[in-house]
């Protein structure tokens, strides 16, 4: 069964449903507390690989 192509008007109307209001776009976000910020160590995997390579050589 072939999928019916959506009209441009239908796509535009669909996008307009989720547009934020001016107020919500300009509203300042509160700065989170230090305890609320979750960090992620992006280099952990690279360090693991390096450590395993170093260990394998010994």
Curated annotation (Swiss-Prot):
Pfam family, one: NinE
InterPro entries for the chain: NINE
Superkingdom field: Viruses
Membership in a protein family: Belongs to the ninE family.
Name of protein: Protein ninE
Record organism: Salmonella phage P22 (Bacteriophage P22)
Taxonomic lineage: Viruses, Duplodnaviria, Heunggongvirae, Uroviricota, Caudoviricetes
